[in-house]
C-alpha cells in the first residue's frame, strides 16, 4: 500500500468552504479512482490555511497514472483547485512500522 501525502495551502479565510469542497471532492470523485483505499484530511492548528491530505492507494501507479492521468483528475482539481494559494507538495510513502 502507498500513502500519498499532499501539503496544501489555501487562500486565507476560505477554510469553511474548502472543508466542504475537499470532503465533497473525495467522496464524489477521488474515491471512485482505481486503487483508492481511504483518506484522512487534517487542518493546521497554528496555520489554519494549511491542510495535510493523506490518501491510501493500492499501488503508486494507481495515483500517478490511473488517477492523475485519467478522467477523474480534472474533476477533482475543478472542485479543490480554486482554493489553492500555492502549488501543493505531494510525496508518496511506504509503511515502515505502526502501532497495534
Feature map (PLM): residue ranges:
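Residue-level signal for secondary-structure boundary sites
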Residues: 16, 61-63, 98-100
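Short glycine-/aliphatic-rich beta-strand segments at the starts of folded cytosolic domains
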Residues: 2-9
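An amphipathic, aromatic/His-enriched active-site/gating alpha helix that lines ligand/cofactor pockets
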Residues: 24, 28-36, 56-90
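Short hydrophobic/aromatic beta-strand micro-patches
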Residues: 9, 42, 54-56
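Feature marks short, surface-exposed loop/turn motifs that line or immediately flank catalytic pockets
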Residues: 12-14, 45-47, 61
